[in-house]
Amino acid sequence: MLHEGLHTEEDFQRIRDKKAAGEEPWISAYQLLVESQFSQKTADTYPTEWIKRGVSGDENYMNAARGATIVYQQALRWKIEQDDEYAAKAVENLNKWVQTCVGVTGNTNLSLAAGLYGYEFAIAGELLRDYGGWDRADFAAFQNWLLKVFYPANDDFLKRHHDTNALHYWANWCLCNIAAKMAIGIVTDRRDIYNEGIAHLQTGDTNGRLRLSLIHI
């Protein structure tokens, strides 16, 4: 697998160059990231044993949503500013999730949680894979965590879609699970999983298939 994920080194170098030159609109856009509460070196995440979405009175999925956002933004600042303190904090936050979270649960909405946050955690981890301070055993644990916690739910939704008609769910449900499969496949070096996502995008039976999802844009 090619390990550039969502962003390439050329992307990051272009951002660094625009930032160094103080060019607009790039510098103002970057300032929004700098000012984000989630991108700070001190930003902590609060993992839960179960990510719950669609559980009346007991939902906590925003912990995962914020957690993935924090790690992603910290990873972005590390790649752009090349300050290892951002990467160290991002890895600390990811390790907390790996050590704490064992699954995703809820009603049918658990499939949104698995797709959205599985994708977001995976792309954040991919950004950090080359950080020398991420112990290789911890990185392997992160890879296994994605495969255990998110991938089964992604796969089940795209195959079974909660025992409904294949076209029952709007495209966003399917597309986030496709994106999660592709991102997880890349960061875990599982081309078979990546190919599953591509195959569903091209020929799947749900509204995540491009020929069906495009009409909803």
Can you annotate each of these PLM segments?
Residues 186-214:
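Long, repeat-rich segments with strong aromatic
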Residues 167-185, 191:
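Loop-centered beta-sheet repeat module
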Residues 79-82, 185-189:
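Hydrophobic/aromatic side-chain positions at a characteristic register within alpha-helices
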